[in-house]
Design a protein with these regions (language model features):
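Residues at the starts of beta-strands that form the adenosine-phosphate
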Residues: 9, 31-32, 138, 180-181, ...
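Short internal beta-strands
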Residues: 31-40, 218-222, 362-363, 382-391
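Residues in the short beta-alpha loop(s) of Rossmann-like NAD(P)-binding domains
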Residues: 16, 39-41, 145, 223-224, ...
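Nucleotide phosphate-binding/pyrophosphate-handling subdomain across enzymes
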Residues: 2-9, 19-29, 277-384, 398
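Beta-strand->loop->alpha-helix junctions that form or flank phosphate-binding loops
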Residues: 37, 63, 98-102, 235-259, ...
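N-terminal leader/targeting and accessory segments in enzymes
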Residues: 1-99, 398
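Phosphate-binding loop of NTP-binding sites
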Residues: 27-28, 66-69, 78-222, 226-239, ...
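C-terminal helical cap/extension that packs against the catalytic core
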Residues: 49-50, 57, 373-423
Length: 423
């Protein structure tokens, strides 16, 4: 695939991190590349004209010209919707359109662990990388978290493992992408404005499995309603494993993880293994969803021979990632958490589920994003006060003030200061 790929020319749509990364990588390999972005220069944080000029990489900004159609392959930024005019035009010209992770995978000889899901993928990706690293393995964590996939390719060693966070946007434009191990953590309604409908969104996620073979592993969350219903009714590729809070999965899969008597158990029928790995009360990051993230990480790392001791020690120490139910500090008996990455109702749901009561919640969102029903249960039973901010503060007030005291604030700073006084 590498040799064939280097005989092609590439137009990269989008000058963000992954676009610049793949352009520079392909250029170093001798390919003909061109970057195009419709944004103005001041908005392009990763565009360094001096570097591009030095490396003889052509580019245009402020709009897409027809020059991009002179190239064999288009590598599309995840932010560009499939129904955008430029993509429609490319399709009409029968251009091959791929994502950065697809093209980067053509040049990756290391085994790839690919992780996707509506929620939890960053935490699980970083956690998986940390467990493997503590086992002494050479690990490159990249994708939707930190470095772009293409930025780690030159650093790969013979024994490296790539742990890749993948979004539905990236998976949508894959064709040959083939991870050694893949995990789908959950799939709930999100990004419908990009995909058009939930069916398209779900199918984009399942592209992670489409090229896997008997030597590969596919893992999914058996507790997630959509995963359980949809994956049970289709033929999946690779060695299929699952994780669940229900011990019954031992009878349904050859390998997996489950919770019983507050312990995560790992089982592999072929290897005659069924044993506890860790007590869930010893996991540093709290919440049912983080137990599920931990089970996914256990299954992914067991494939590479990681010991129970290393897994347990890592889970006891792992502090999570920034902005995802991140413990900030405790002041005068009040514990402060930052969950600003909770950008949909399902992620807010799992955050509220992690705390039993007496929650003071700073809440806000985009205008028109007013489907509060998903979190009503926990708001009414566990939250004692809401500080509403952003475009939806009035809608939050109207929806919840009858049940919970709601204070409308003009800024996040005001909400933090007022909530601090109330705590």
């Amino acid at each position: 695939m590498k040799k064939e790929a280097l005989n092609k020319s590439y137009a990269i749509l989008g000058a963000a991190r992954s676009g610049i990364g793949i352009a520079r990588f392909l250029k170093r390999k001798g390919a003909d590349v061109f970057i195009s972005d419709e944004s103005s220069e001041e908005k392009l944080l990763y565009l360094d004209k001096d570097i591009l000029d030095k490396e003889n990489i052509g580019y245009e900004i402020g709009g897409h010209s027809d020059k991009i159609f002179d190239y064999d392959i288009i590598i599309k930024s995840p932010g560009i919707k499939p129904d955008s005019e430029i993509i429609k035009k490319a399709v009409s010209k029968n251009k091959e359109i791929y994502s950065e992770i697809e093209v980067a995978s053509w040049f990756c000889d290391a085994p790839i662990i690919a992780i996707t899901g509506t929620n939890g993928k960053t935490t699980t990706t970083v956690l998986t990388g940390e467990i493997l690293s503590r086992q002494g393995l050479d690990v490159k964590v990249c994708g939707n978290v930190g470095l772009a996939f293409s930025e780690v390719l030159d650093d790969l060693k013979e024994n490296s493992i790539v742990v890749l966070e993948t979004s539905s946007f990236q998976l949508f434009n894959t064709k040959y992408f083939k991870p050694k191990a893949a995990a789908v953590l959950n799939v709930t309604v999100d990004h419908i404005d990009w995909h058009g409908n939930f069916e398209n969104y779900f199918e984009a996620k399942t592209n992670i499995n489409i090229n896997q073979t008997d030597e590969d592993y596919f893992i999914y969350n058996y507790d997630d309603p959509e995963c359980k219903a949809r994956f049970a009714g289709r033929t999946l590729n690779g060695n299929v494993c699952a994780f669940s809070y229900e011990p019954e999965i031992q009878t349904l899969f050859k390998a997996g993880a489950y919770v019983e008597k507050n312990k995560i158990n790992y089982f592999d029928i072929i290897k005659y293994i069924n044993a506890p790995v860790i007590d869930i009360r010893d996991i540093f990051i709290k919440g049912k969803h983080n137990v599920q993230n931990a089970m996914a990480a256990i299954l992914l790392t067991k494939i590479f021979g990681v010991t129970d001791e290393v897994i347990a020690d890592t889970l006891k120490d792992f502090k999570g990632v920034e902005h995802r139910i991140e413990f900030v500090r405790e002041i005068d008996g009040v514990r402060y958490y930052n969950d600003s990455k909770a950008t949909n109702y399902d992620s807010t749901y799992v955050a509220l589920e992690s705390f039993p009561s007496d929650i003071i919640l700073i809440m806000g969102g985009k205008k028109g994003d007013n489907n509060f029903a998903r979190v009503d249960e926990f708001i009414k039973s566990r939250v004692k006060k809401i500080f509403a901010i952003g475009q939806t503060r009035d809608a939050i007030y109207e929806h919840y003030n009858e049940f919970v005291k709601v204070v409308k604030c003009d800024s996040l700073e005001e909400a933090v200061n007022k909530s601090n006084k109330d705590s």
